[in-house]
């Protein structure tokens, strides 16, 4: 005589919490499974990473054309010749901090055209 799903549900509904815990343990042993909650893979909503809005432009190296890079740094930062030269020769150095992505990309492009190696962080 096979039990219907309805009969099984009624039998489970009549049990106490302690009896249900024992029943679950018996199922785990009999079928060699675990009743632990399965971790659900994080979806896009769960991984709501805040997009970076402020960037730093770092001069990594000045490359082969140091004079052109110094001119580009002076133009971008408004520094004097000596300060710009010291900054370029002291690479890696942060040229600008807390700027927008667009401004950072534009500055990076100008410096790379002058021969520098630049990173946007």
Swiss-Prot record:
GO CC terms of this entry: cytosolic large ribosomal subunit
Alphabetical keyword list: Ribonucleoprotein, Ribosomal protein
InterPro entries documented for this protein: Ribosomal_bL12, Ribosomal_bL12_C, Ribosomal_bL12_C/ClpS-like, Ribosomal_bL12_oligo, Ribosomal_bL12_oligo_N_sf
GO biological process: translation
GO MF term list: mRNA binding; structural constituent of ribosome
Recorded family membership: Belongs to the bacterial ribosomal protein bL12 family.
Biological role: Forms part of the ribosomal stalk which helps the ribosome interact with GTP-bound translation factors. Is thus essential for accurate translation.
Subunit note: Homodimer. Part of the ribosomal stalk of the 50S ribosomal subunit. Forms a multimeric L10(L12)X complex, where L10 forms an elongated spine to which 2 to 4 L12 dimers bind in a sequential fashion. Binds GTP-bound translation factors.
Name of the protein in question: Large ribosomal subunit protein bL12
Species this protein is from: Acinetobacter baylyi (strain ATCC 33305 / BD413 / ADP1)
Species lineage: Bacteria, Pseudomonadati, Pseudomonadota, Gammaproteobacteria, Moraxellales
Gene: rplL
């Amino acid at each position: 005589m096979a039990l219907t799903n309805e009969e099984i549900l009624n039998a489970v509904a009549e049990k106490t919490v302690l009896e249900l815990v024992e029943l679950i343990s018996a199922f785990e042993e009999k079928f060699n499974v675990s009743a632990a909650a399965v971790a659900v893979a994080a979806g896009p909503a769960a991984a709501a990473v805040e997009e970076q809005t402020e960037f730093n432009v770092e001069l990594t190296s000045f490359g082969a054309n140091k004079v052109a890079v110094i001119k580009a740094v002076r133009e971008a930062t408004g520094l004097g010749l000596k300060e710009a030269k010291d900054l370029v020769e002291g690479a890696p150095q942060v040229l600008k901090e807390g700027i927008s992505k667009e401004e950072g990309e534009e500055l990076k492009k100008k410096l790379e055209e002058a021969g520098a190696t630049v990173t946007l962080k």
